[in-house]
Amino acid sequence: MALTKEQKQEIIKQNSHFAKDTGSSEVQIAILSAEIKQLSEHLKQHPHDFHSKRGLFMKNSKRRNLVKYLANQN
């Protein structure tokens, strides 16, 4: 269900500012977006998986806060 190490490295490579940039807001938002997409696909198959649904809501909230932070910084 979680992103594999290779998937995460590819997302980091595409969105990073420098070689080992894993903590910038853009990278965090990109990783959360991929996880949200994956969880959404899982919930289409398993609509009564409430534990995953809560995780989806939490990831959405975290991404929303990061996007808001990024908008205020730029």
Curated annotation (Swiss-Prot):
SMART domains listed in its UniProt record: Ribosomal_S15
Q: Which GO terms describe its biological process?
A: translation
GO CC entries: cytosolic small ribosomal subunit
Q: Does the keyword Oxidoreductase apply?
A: no
The answer to whether the entry has keyword Ribosomal protein is yes
Cited InterPro entries: Ribosomal_uS15 (IPR000589), Ribosomal_uS15_bac-type (IPR005290), uS15_NS1_RNA-bd_sf (IPR009068)
Q: Which UniProt keywords apply?
A: Ribonucleoprotein, Ribosomal protein, RNA-binding, rRNA-binding
- One of its Pfam families is Ribosomal_S15
Instruction: Give a GO molecular function annotation for the protein.
Output: rRNA binding
The record's section on Gene3D superfamilies has:
S15/NS1, RNA-binding
Entry function = One of the primary rRNA binding proteins, it binds directly to 16S rRNA where it helps nucleate assembly of the platform of the 30S subunit by binding and bridging several RNA helices of the 16S rRNA. Forms an intersubunit bridge (bridge B4) with the 23S rRNA of the 50S subunit in the ribosome.
NCBIfam families the UniProt entry points to = S15_bact
Describe its assembly: Part of the 30S ribosomal subunit. Forms a bridge to the 50S subunit in the 70S ribosome, contacting the 23S rRNA.
What family classification does the UniProt entry report for this protein?
A: Belongs to the universal ribosomal protein uS15 family.
Q: What is this protein called?
A: Small ribosomal subunit protein uS15
**Coding gene?**
rpsO
